Amino acid sequence: MSVLPRYLLPDNSEVDETGRLSIAGCDLIDLAMEHNTPLFVYDEDHMRARCQEAVAAFPDGVAYATKAFLCKAMAQLAYEEGMDLDVATGGELHVALEADVPADRLIFHGNNKSMRELVAAIDAGVGTIVIDSRTEIAKLQSILAASDRTVRVMIRVNPGIEAHTHEFLQTGATDSKFGISIDGGLAKKAVDQVRSIPALDLVGVHAHVGSQVFEASSFARAVEVLADFIAQIDVPALSIGGGLGVPYVEGEAAPTITEWGRAISTALAGTGLRVKMHAEPGRAIVARAAVTLYTAGTIKEIPGVRTYVSVDGGMSDNPRPVLYGSGYEVFLARATSADRTLEVRLVGKHCESGDVIVRDGSVPGDLQLGDILATPVTGAYGHTMGSNYNMVLRPPVVFAKGGDARLVVRRETYEDLLARDLG
């Protein structure tokens, strides 16, 4: 097995002469000793650079998809770098507002927004609400009936594109819980319905073909399909959503944000349509910015079968392998550049046989109990999809920058586990 590919590490990663890895000047083993493990370590300047790249790639407007990773510090960072924020629940809306992101810089998504969530968004002054169904149109009409307010809205449509990704990550196909299908005239009926309501200001159309998509052609095809629809309804803006994939394991490759934006702009120019083009990257901003640190607690060799390495985290801090069969790499923080000769299965501490972090991984042959193991590219959909299964404590998050590590989310305590328990 080869050494860990450096392109899977955060931008500001350095390996010293002994093989120890630092991120933004912060030694990972030192961070593990200070904060214990599991621990998420983010390269702050990496995320800022990706935000800046996204703003440049989509000058008409770009929003950070907070579902990928959200805390107050992340919301502030994305806003400071010129991005709007895409929120999809009342909780994400609340965190963004608590981070002092102006409400008019928020785009409110979700396929089943409750009346309470819609009222909260409207009262806060959210910039745009993305309508996901005709049911939602009726909800908005009811809320605004006795008001003189006008709400900016987009309509999420399904272009009928089946992107090459995991079934659970396909969101633009006709058979999807999200959006309103263009086929059969359903989206056109929704447009007509919105335009019949004076309180709703239709400013564009939104679509999302899927997540973890490696082929820019999927997005280009969506633009072509959507352009035909937009030409019929005459709206000023099109949002292509997010979904740009990132490499997680050796051998994978994906377009950069700049290349993604260029492919979409080229496709739009080819249609002859003159509209503003928006996008909503999330994973592409944060995934490679972080690594997760664990401590090796058990090494179990089954002769002729495999070696299991159990760590102090698992599906509670990274459920993606269980949900999607996602692959990850693993390495030793003290020997980042070492040849990985020992084949292992990295597993968590939960009471589930499926609690696997890295199914077919490799580490240096001198792995020892107590070693700090790291999995790269864990900045997206780890922290936000985490849980308290088995009543484990959710890990802390640090932002590393210029040799300083700032604790932005503390580790939970046992008292936190009982905070909602009324006995």
How does the language model describe each region?
Residues 11, 19, 38, 60-62, ...:
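A generic secondary-structure signal marking the coil-to-beta-strand transition
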Residues 27, 43-46, 50, 54, ...:
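General structural feature for long, well-ordered alpha-helical segments within catalytic domains
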Residues 74-75, 96-97, 118, 140-141, ...:
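Short glycine-/acidic-enriched loop or helix-start segments at secondary-structure transitions
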Residues 2-3, 143, 160-300, 363, ...:
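Active-site loop/helix belt of alpha/beta enzymes
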Residues 274-423:
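Charged (often Lys/Glu-rich) extended helix/loop segments that serve as interaction or gating elements
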Residues 1-152, 188, 195-201, 403-423:
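A charged N-terminal "starter" segment
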Residues 46, 67-71, 88-92, 111-113, ...:
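Active-site beta-loop-alpha junctions enriched in small/polar residues
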Residues 61-63, 82-84, 105-107, 128, ...:
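Structural preference for beta-strand elements that scaffold enzyme active sites
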